[in-house]
């Protein structure tokens, strides 16, 4: 897909685990090591310019069970990174996994709570250049996205 001309300027957003997301933030090599499923594109985040960005969907081998303060904060950092990449002007599209049954982020390895998947998906489709990150803790439930 990456080699196809229509994806030459695409940012690939993959489902990350929190541990490797944090490792990337700290500049550790495991932050760019390939993973399973759509995290196979994780190494692309180490390129210049980055071709991928991660959205944490779980930790310690399990999907996030609830949208607690820690999960909200980690997702906020991920969305800030994605927003900064989109604002760079290098990308004309984002590619990410979608579960059309739920209108939610697709997931296969981790099984995060469906509400989290829906909120992440809704925030991803709202990422636009020059706009504030769509994920914030300024609204009820800790997200800038309306709850279903």
Predicted regions and their residues:
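Macrodomain-like recognition of ADP-ribose-binding/processing modules
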Residues: 1-148
């Amino acid at each position: 897909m990456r080699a196809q001309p229509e994806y030459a300027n695409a940012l690939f957003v993959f489902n990350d685990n929190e541990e490797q997301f944090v490792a990337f933030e700290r500049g550790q090599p495991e932050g760019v090591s390939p993973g399973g499923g759509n995290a196979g594109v994780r190494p692309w985040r180490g390129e210049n310019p980055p071709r991928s960005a991660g959205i944490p969907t779980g930790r310690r081998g399990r999907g996030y069970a609830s949208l607690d303060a820690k999960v909200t904060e980690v997702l906020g950092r991920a969305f800030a990174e994605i927003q900064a990449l989109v604002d760079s002007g290098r990308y004309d599209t984002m590619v990410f996994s979608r579960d059309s049954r739920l209108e939610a982020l697709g997931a296969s390895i981790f099984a995060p709570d469906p509400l989290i998947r829906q909120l992440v998906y809704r925030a991803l489709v709202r990422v636009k250049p020059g706009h504030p990150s769509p994920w914030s803790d300024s609204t009820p439930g800790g997200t800038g996205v309306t709850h279903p």
